[in-house]
């Protein structure tokens, strides 16, 4: 549990252990029942080791953000992101539901043919600014500038960066749809995360947000490349905020909101459209002039 990232990634074992790490805590109740059945004080004492280990590793991440979140400032920005699932035909539905939830900026991934145009048409009155690259796009109430596509080591474009310019300050936004990760095939995903971390590290903007489907959990060793330079806020109500699959129940957090230089007053998962991913939604205090 504590050293899963040190296990060599042979035959995909590293990837599997990394992503299963939070669930290893489920062994503790089973072990507790066995210890109680045996009436062994030694067994109960030994059980403290995995219990305390799990709490040490994951305890800080499950504390509700609402316990310590900064107060919303005079000017905030609500940002939502979702992998809308290609082939559902519900990209515009997702976008409209996220808009109705009060989002100022909406980032979507896994856009397929024609879906970006349908989203733009659905949102054009309230979100006149947009930038789309390949399968990812951003729609904003605020002007966008310095927008560019990002290949991130691949031969096709699944990421972008843009600057969101508000009256109360600007922020640099990165949107990514990382390549899929399977036990025997996650090289492209790993390379995209390395390249994204490099782009973020060299970006001089003080205020930054990276969102999207990273196809990596927070315990994935490849995700550490980016999570060590950007911060992921806890969930409003605590726990680990699993986003996939949406049904029958979520088991992994593949979709993230990562920030630098900005206060996050809220961070939640929301349902939208027909996707198999929950959307992620964060509210940020704008930096001011």
Protein language model annotation of sequence segments:
Residues 1-121, 288:
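N-terminal, active-site-proximal structural segment of metallo-dependent hydrolase catalytic domains
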């Amino acid at each position: 549990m504590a050293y899963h990232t040190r296990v060599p990634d042979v035959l995909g074992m590293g990837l599997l252990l990394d992503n299963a790490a939070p669930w290893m805590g489920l062994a503790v109740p089973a072990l507790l029942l066995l210890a109680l059945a045996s009436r062994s004080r030694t067994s109960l004492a030994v059980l403290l080791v995995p219990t305390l280990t799990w709490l040490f590793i994951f305890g800080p991440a499950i504390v509700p953000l609402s316990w310590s979140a900064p107060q919303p400032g005079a000017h905030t920005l609500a940002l939502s992101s979702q992998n809308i699932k290609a082939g559902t035909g519900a990209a515009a539905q997702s976008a409209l539901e996220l808009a109705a939830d009060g989002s100022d900026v909406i980032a979507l991934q896994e856009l397929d043919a024609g879906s970006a145009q349908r989203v733009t048409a659905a949102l054009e009155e309230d979100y006149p600014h947009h930038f789309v690259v390949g399968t990812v796009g951003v729609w904003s109430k605020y002007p966008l500038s310095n927008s560019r596509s990002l290949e991130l080591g691949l031969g096709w474009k699944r990421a972008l960066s843009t600057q969101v310019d508000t009256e109360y300050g600007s922020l640099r936004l990165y949107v990514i749809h990382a390549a899929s990760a399977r036990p025997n095939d996650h090289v492209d995903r790993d390379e995209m995360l390395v390249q994204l971390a490099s782009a973020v590290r060299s970006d001089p903007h003080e205020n930054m947000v990276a969102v999207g489907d990273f196809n990596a959990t927070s315990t994935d060793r490849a995700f550490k490349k980016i999570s060590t330079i950007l911060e992921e806020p806890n969930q409003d109500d605590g726990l680990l905020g699993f986003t996939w699959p949406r049904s029958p129940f979520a088991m992994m957090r593949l979709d993230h909101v990562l920030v630098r230089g900005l206060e996050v007053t809220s961070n939640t998962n929301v349902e939208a459209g027909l996707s198999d991913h929950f959307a992620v939604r964060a509210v940020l205090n704008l930096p001011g002039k």
